[in-house]
Structure formats: structure tokens, C-alpha cells
Regions:
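Low-complexity, Pro/Ser/Thr- and charge-rich linker/hinge segments at domain boundaries
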Residues: 96-117, 122, 126
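C-terminal beta-strand-rich structural cap/linker in extracellular carbohydrate-active enzymes
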Residues: 708-726
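Immunoglobulin-like IPT/TIG beta-sandwich domains and homologous Ig-like subdomains
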Residues: 21-85
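Substrate-binding/active-site clefts of carbohydrate-active enzymes
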Residues: 124-334, 339, 358-369, 373, ...
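Beta-strand/beta-sandwich contexts
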Residues: 5-36, 96-99
């Protein structure tokens, strides 16, 4: 007699799906003891099982269905666990739900939004009377320890939605909230959320899937969007896949897991945390260097370390080249969009994952949700790198997406161009030349990442270098900012690039100081440039800190968010005089920005810093310019003067053109980049004056209401910021 445990099905992922998706394919991952050899059938109308994929582990079975004709309802899956008449059978009811809205109706975040980034564990605790949640692994909640959990949750965020609307932000991005059931390790924990152990479940310490949906619904009612942080590059060590690999190629470089471990060791130079399980010589650590993915001269070892190396030993590296892994991840992102109603995704460690797999994900999301948005974290401070990752980039290297020319027969003659789709002259003409970037782009040249938004680490880097400098005639201070935008021609869409001063992985912009003048200059820039702005929680009350000792020093608890806090910075009464001053100033700018078409739709103009002063303008076209534009052979986008104007559709004389009003059509940002008084030389900027107007031009300062005549010189105080509108 066999002592083997009976076959079972203990889990199906995803637990439900949605009828009417543009891609009719559904992958179901069945998990259970001995499930690999099971047979699965269904007679549900409009559904057909295309294939069963039996992986190396006996405890997984992948079922691929085609749902092209299926309507919402309960689909019956008949599972036979062994062959023969006496084989154990089961019927599983699988819900196919009706979509709440069409994919085209899901609107993502744009440059008209301002994202507020926070860490749920450190922002606010809503469930204050509940006992600690029991998890499989050991953990502690201790607010005195910067690297342990502090107890914040989704309910705490929900309870403070009015705070965000008062401040004036329009979207919330918080670090991952999915289950991270990993043990504390040498005084550190996964409170940050980047070590997923269940891709379909909110971590119980943060709340439930239902609470996530409630938070999202109420945020939408208040005009706030929700951006979900996801990680395709890696999972957590305690994910069930790691202890029972579906297949050996489910992870990159998994060999070290089966070999004896050495004593615990530091995971990377300069990193204080250690991995309790130890590592061995087979362990492949990522180099954290992203440039090999675009480097035309990159060595194979450098590319492998970047893409296949593990971020840390406790975060196994997923293999996106495995089509089953990629299908699982793509479906997971779609499931959260449909189930929770999120408005965007921030993809962590984007270039560390396989570029071709990520492009296939982005292409499918673009097709399913054409107005949705995804931002990929791409931590390289050179614009050419991040621009190469953006959708429709002209500089994306083909080899980055795995594009290769076909081999010529015996090297006797060159292979035809990859995009002519002709037979390749291989031996006996037995093969055809594969299309470059097959399954990535409709046309193989140029390759396309399909990623709408990238992160502007170049702006972050230049701004943080410039903040303590005096602006000289050439390179330092505001010259760094000016030169950053010189390279915007590399981006297909600069207005869809996300800019920021700091985040949870960097020093706070203020460092250990409290320089309000420096912060106001940076914020004024951030909120007016051709970008999608992102703020880090607490900036509005001048929270500071550096990572010199620990990451937790830049991830401090928001005052008033937790039981026992002495004060609450959520209220005017709980903030200090200095904090209220910054909060009021920033709130005015944020609320003004929501109404400023000049900032979000206008043309950006910048002037080289002159005698320490940096000037940037945003202009909407006037009615006269719109009329001229309408008669031109080519027409710049002018959404406020028509929709937009097309050649030959001149604006009638005297007509009122929506949005082309005199007041508010122009925004002028003036920054004194020195610690001394400086002069605004009006004559230098007269091209910004409305046509035919040489007399007084009165501009209103947005935060103070003070009036300035921009046709006259005036003096700027040290590090002064003027945000003018006229």
C-alpha cells in the first residue's frame, strides 16, 4: 500500500476573475498535495481549457483557459485527482465576476495630479484597540526601534483622508501593503512591505482586502486617487514558492538555496542588516548597478548580476523570462485594478526585472487600460537612461528587450533587416528570420517598453546637489537645475515623468536641518516643472532626517498618528508655528496648482541663470496665437485654444477662446539661487510680456497675494522664491 497523502487542491490563484477582458486567457495556479497529475475539465458556456501545464513540483498545476465567450457567473471546474473509475473527484465553483467599468474608463494619474507618498506602518494607526495580529512568523511592534514595525494601518490612512484634501494633494501612493509574513531579523523587519509572501492578500497587520477597497472608495469620493506599489522583481523568502519551487526556473539563481549555508553575513557593503539563514558561494547578489541593461558593451556577468542577482538574500529573485511566472504577475496586477479600483501602479525595482517580460506586461495593461498609468522606479541619475525606458522612446536599445538579428547561413551573406519579415538565409532555408522583439511590439522596429512614466532621479540628484550651493555663472547651484531640463528632448513625454525631492529610500530633502527657504525653492520648482510631482509624507511639516544610521531615520512616525503621541500634526493646533507656516504655504501652492492650466498644459520656458537668478515660465497661448496657430502648417498642442486647433480652422475675430484668458495664462517662477540679495532684470525677460504690452504688467504672487510689476527691476532677498501669475 502507498503511504502517499491523498491528492488535494488547497488553493486556486486568483480566487476569482472577470468576464469580458480583452485578453481572454486566464491562468489558474492550483496548489495542493499531488495536484500536478490531476485532470481539469469544464463545460461552462464560452469557456475552454486550452492546456494543463504540469510543473516540476508535484504540488502545482497550471490551468490555462480561454474565456472569449464567457459571461459572468459561477464556472464549475471538475477536478479528477487520479486516473481510473475510482479516481477521487471534486467540483470547484470558480466565480467569473462582472467588471464594474470598462478598462477605458479607468483614469490613471497624470501631470495634473500631485502624489503624496507615505509608509502605512509609519503614518497612522486606525485600529487602536485591537490585539496584535497572529502571523506564522515571529514579529514585534516596537515604536522605539526604527527598523521594527510601529503599527500603522490602512484604517489610519482612511481616517485622515480629509487631511490630504486640506493639504491639496490629489493622489496617494503608499509602500506595498501585501502580506509580508517574514520573521524579524537582527532588529529589522519587513514593515516596508517589499518582501511579498502572498500576492493576493493584504497583510493582516495593515488590514484586509475589504478595508483596502473601502479606503479606495472613500478616497475617490473625496477626489483622491490611489497608486498601488507592486514588486515583480522579487518576493519574500517565506513565500510558499521558495520552500516548494514550482520549477527550478521559477527563480533566478536558486541553486544556493539547496546548498549548505555559511554563517550569517552582511548582505551588501554598507548595509547593516544580516540574513539569519546565512548564504554560500552559490548565492548571486545583484550589483545594484542598472546601467548594464542599456550598455552596448556590457559583459554577460554584469548583465546577469543586475537582472538575475538577488536584491538581498531574504528576497528571492523571480524569473520573468519564465512565461508562467510572467503570466501570474500580469494577472495579479489586473486583479488588483479590477478588485480594488486602484488608479495607478508604482513598480518597484523596474530595471532589475527582465525588460522583455516587463514590456509584455506594460503592453497588455496599455491595451486593457489605455488611460491608466504606471510609474517604474529607475534609479539612475542620467536622463538618457530613464528616457530609454519610457514608452515610445526613440533611444531604447533593441538588445535591452532581447532583440537579436537572425543568423546568416554559414556567414555567407548578411541577414536581411529584422523588420522586413522575410525568410532568413539559414541553411536549406529551413527557418524564417524571427521578428525582432516578437510579442513586444506590433512592429519590431523600434522596440517599445510601453512604460508611460519613469522617475526623474536626475532632477532629484541635481536638486539635492544644488541646494547648498551658490549659483555661479556656469555649473553650480541653479545651473544644475537648468541643465537637467536641457535633456528633456530625450523623453517622448516629459510631462509624464515623475519628479520628487526625496522618498523612503533617500535622505529627506532637509537632511538634519530646517531650512525653510531652501525647501520652498525646491517645492516651487517641483510643483511647476513639466513633470508629475511627488511629495514624501511629512514634507509639509518639515520632517527631516538622514540614512546615516538607519533607513528608519527617514521613515519616522507622523506626529499624532499613534496612541500616546504628545501632539497631532494633522491639526493646526497640534503643529508648531514653523510647521503651520510651511503647511499654509504649501497648501496654497497645491490648491492653486489644481486650477492652473498654465502649469499643467502650458509651454515651459527657462532662462539660463543670470547673476544668481533662475527664471522659468509657463505660458498658455493667447487667442491671437491660437488664430495664427490654426492657419499654420503645423500646430503645437494648445488644448486651451480649441481642442486642439487644426490647420485651416482659424479662430474668428473677437471670439472667446476657452482658457486663453489674460489672467492666469502666464506663470513666472523666480528663484534667487544665492545667499545674497539679487536683482530681477526685467528687460532680460521681456519676451514673456504679452504682445504689444510695454507698460505695467502686474503679476500676483500666488502665496502672499503681493503685486509685482514685471516690466521693472526689483530686488530679491537671499534665497527668495516668487511664484507669480499674470
Amino acid at each position: 500500500m502507498s503511504n502517499a497523502a491523498p491528492a488535494t487542491v488547497s488553493r486556486i490563484e486568483p480566487a476569482n476573475w472577470y468576464a469580458g477582458m480583452k485578453n481572454p486567457t486566464l491562468q489558474l495556479m492550483l496548489t495542493g498535495n499531488g495536484i500536478r497529475e490531476a485532470e481539469v475539465t469544464t463545460d461552462y458556456p464560452g469557456a475552454k481549457i486550452d492546456s494543463l501545464v504540469r510543473l516540476e513540483s508535484p504540488n502545482y498545476l497550471l490551468v490555462y483557459l480561454n474565456l472569449s465567450g464567457a459571461q459572468p457567473g459561477d464556472m464549475k471546474l471538475r477536478i479528477t485527482f487520479s486516473k481510473g473509475k475510482k479516481g477521487k473527484k471534486a467540483i470547484v465553483t470558480y466565480p467569473l465576476l462582472k467588471r464594474e467599468k470598462a478598462g477605458e474608463e479607468r483614469m490613471g494619474f497624470t501631470n495634473k495630479d500631485v502624489l503624496y507618498m507615505l509608509m502605512p506602518d509609519r503614518f497612522a494607526q486606525g485600529h487602536r484597540d485591537s490585539k496584535p495580529v497572529k502571523m506564522k512568523t515571529q514579529y514585534a511592534i516596537d515604536r522605539s526601534q526604527p527598523s521594527l514595525r510601529h503599527g500603522g494601518d490602512l484604517e489610519g490612512i482612511r481616517q485622515h483622508l480629509d487631511y490630504f484634501t486640506e493639504l491639496g494633494v490629489t493622489a496617494l501612493w503608499f509602500t506595498p501593503v501585501l502580506e509580508n509574513d517574514s520573521p524579524d531579523n537582527n532588529g529589522a523587519s519587513t514593515y516596508h512591505g517589499y518582501a511579498t509572501t502572498d500576492y493576493y492578500k493584504v497583510d493582516p497587520r495593515f488590514g484586509t482586502n475589504e478595508e483596502y477597497r473601502r479606503l479606495t472608495d472613500e478616497a475617490h469620493q473625496k477626489g483622491l486617487k490611489i497608486v498601488m506599489d507592486m514588486i515583480f522583481n522579487h518576493c519574500g523568502m517565506e513565500h510558499p514558492w521558495v520552500s516548494d519551487l514550482p520549477s527550478q526556473d521559477w527563480l533566478n539563481a536558486p541553486e544556493w538555496l539547496a546548498a549548505p549555508k555559511q554563517a550569517p553575513t552582511a548582505v551588501a557593503e554598507g548595509q547593516s542588516t544580516t540574513y539569519a539563514g546565512g548564504i554560500n558561494d552559490l548565492y548571486l547578489q545583484t550589483s545594484y548597478k542598472l546601467t548594464p541593461v542599456v550598455d552596448p558593451y556590457a559583459s554577460e556577468i554584469d548583465k546577469r548580476e543586475t537582472v538575475d542577482g538577488w536584491f538581498v538574500p531574504s528576497m528571492p529573485d523571480l524569473n520573468q523570462r519564465n512565461p508562467h511566472v510572467m503570466r501570474y504577475l500580469i494577472q495579479n496586477s489586473i486583479w488588483w485594478i479590477e478588485t480594488i479600483g486602484i488608479d495607478g501602479i508604482r513598480m518597484d525595482t523596474y530595471p532589475y526585472a527582465d525588460a522583455k517580460g516587463m514590456a509584455s506586461w506594460m503592453k497588455e495593461l496599455n491595451q486593457e487600460y489605455p488611460n491608466f498609468n504606471v510609474v517604474g522606479e529607475s534609479w539612475v541619475t542620467e536622463p538618457a537612461f530613464t528616457a530609454a525606458l519610457q514608452k515610445d522612446s526613440r533611444i531604447t536599445p533593441p538588445y535591452m528587450l532581447g532583440c537579436k538579428p537572425c543568423p546568416a547561413a554559414n556567414n555567407s551573406k548578411p541577414c536581411p533587416k529584422a523588420n522586413d519579415n522575410k525568410p532568413c538565409p539559414v541553411a536549406n532555408n529551413s527557418k524564417h528570420c524571427p521578428r525582432v522583439c516578437d510579442n513586444i511590439a506590433d512592429t519590431p522596429t523600434p522596440p517599445n517598453t510601453w512604460l508611460n512614466t519613469v522617475m526623474d532621479f536626475s532632477f532629484f540628484d541635481r536638486l539635492n546637489a544644488a541646494k547648498y550651493e551658490e549659483t555661479d555663472p556656469w555649473w553650480n547651484g541653479m545651473n544644475r537645475i537648468y541643465n537637467n531640463f536641457v535633456y528633456d528632448y530625450l523623453y517622448p513625454n516629459p510631462k509624464s515623468v515623475l519628479a520628487f525631492l526625496d522618498n523612503h529610500d533617500t535622505d529627506r530633502f532637509l537632511g538634519d536641518g530646517k531650512d525653510s527657504l531652501m525647501l520652498k525653492q525646491a517645492l516651487a520648482l517641483l510643483l511647476t516643472i513639466n513633470r508629475i510631482p511627488q511629495l514624501y509624507y511629512g514634507t509639509e511639516i518639515m520632517m527631516n532626517g538622514t540614512k546615516a544610521v538607519t533607513d528608519g531615520n527617514v521613515r519616522k512616525d507622523f506626529p499624532g498618528g499613534f496612541p500616546g503621541d504628545e501632539r497631532s500634526a494633522f491639526t493646526k493646533e497640534g503643529r508648531t508655528k514653523e510647521e503651520n507656516s510651511m503647511f499654509r504655504w504649501l497648501s496654497k501652492v497645491l490648491h492653486w496648482r489644481q486650477q492652473s492650466k498654465a502649469v499643467t498644459e502650458g509651454r515651459q520656458v527657462q532662462f539660463t541663470p543670470y547673476k544668481g537668478v533662475y527664471v522659468m515660465a509657463h505660458q498658455l497661448p493667447t487667442c491671437a496665437q491660437a488664430a495664427t496657430c490654426a492657419q499654420a502648417a503645423t500646430c503645437p498642442q494648445a488644448t486651451t485654444c480649441g481642442s486642439p486647433n487644426q490647420p485651416g480652422t482659424a479662430t474668428p475675430a473677437g471670439a472667446t477662446v476657452p482658457g486663453a484668458s489674460a489672467s492666469g495664462s502666464n506663470v513666472l517662477l523666480i528663484l534667487n539661487g544665492t545667499s545674497k540679495p539679487a536683482t530681477f532684470n526685467a528687460e532680460r525677460y521681456k519676451e514673456l510680456w504679452p504682445a504689444g504690452q510695454q507698460a505695467t504688467i502686474t503679476a500676483r504672487e500666488v502665496t502672499s497675494g503681493r503685486k509685482y510689476d514685471i516690466t521693472k527691476d526689483f530686488t530679491l532677498s537671499p534665497r527668495q522664491t516668487l511664484l507669480l501669475e499674470y
